[in-house]
A protein has these predicted regions:
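Conserved non-catalytic scaffold segment of RNase H-like nuclease domains
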Residues: 4-5, 10-143, 156-177
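Active-site phosphate/pyrophosphate-handling residues
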Residues: 129, 148, 184
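Acidic, divalent-metal-coordinating active-site segment for phosphoryl/phosphodiester hydrolysis
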Residues: 181-189
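Conserved small/polar residues in nucleotide/adenosyl-binding loops
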Residues: 1-6, 193-196
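A short, structured active-site edge motif that brings together acidic residues
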Residues: 142-151
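Ser/Thr-glycine-rich phosphate-binding loops at phosphate-binding pockets of nucleotides
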Residues: 43-47, 186, 193-194
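Non-catalytic alpha-helical coupling and interface elements of nucleotide-dependent molecular machines
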Residues: 115, 191-192
Length: 196
């Protein structure tokens, strides 16, 4: 996909040129907050409602500067069965989660992994609400950064701010509706937001 096709009509040429070189510049730029360790996180759930659905996968990466220095990946054993629709979307089956830790155990392990670092998630309100609905989930992090909101500020002329769209456009890892692949894509996209 060409940058010209991915921006809103009427976008000035200098903005298009800036977006076109963004991925290359992100490899060499100096960053602010991103130079500190941050946790890039994604979850998969049995549905969209925090009241009616549950976590089934949590993935996170510790990003230090431009490098992923540690990973956290776990399935989560839900109390309800995973529907065929969710299995089709995520490829996560009931067999995958059968011996997985409970949500309380998984979120406690996540809190240990995060260790007080800021957490970045695409549409962070969704992931945070599921994490914090679990006992002990409020202890995961005090700082949650929504990369969706950040992309709308940093790249306002993009036609879409979906993670899959941006990952494809800027040559980051692909998005697959699996938490670990989405974390890989988001790590790449996060570096784009903060380049000069």
């Amino acid at each position: 996909m060409l940058i010209e096709d991915a921006v809103s009509s009427g976008t000035p040429q200098f903005v298009i040129d800036s977006y076109a070189t963004l991925a290359e510049r992100a490899k060499t730029q100096s960053f602010g907050l991103i130079e500190e360790d941050v946790i890039v996180l994604d979850t998969e759930t049995t549905g969209l409602s925090v009241q009616d659905n549950e976590l089934i996968e949590i993935s996170a990466a510790r990003l230090s500067g431009r490098e992923v220095v540690d990973r956290f990946d776990t399935f989560v054993h839900p109390k309800q069965l995973i529907s065929a629709e969710i299995t089709e979307l995520t490829s996560i089956t009931n067999a995958d989660v059968a011996d997985a830790p409970s949500a309380v155990e998984a979120v406690a392990a996540l809190a240990d992994f995060v260790g007080g670092c800021p957490v970045i998630a695409h549409n962070a309100t969704f992931d945070r609400s599921f994490i914090e609905s679990v006992k002990g989930g409020v202890n995961v992090s005090d700082i949650w950064i929504d990369s969706l909101a950040l992309s709308r500020i940093a790249l306002p002329r993009l036609a879409s701010h979906k993670l899959s769209f941006m990952a494809d456009l800027f040559g980051c890892d692909s998005v697959s509706h699996r938490a670990n692949a989405d974390v890989d894509a988001l790590c790449g996209v996060c570096l784009l937001y903060t380049s000069d």
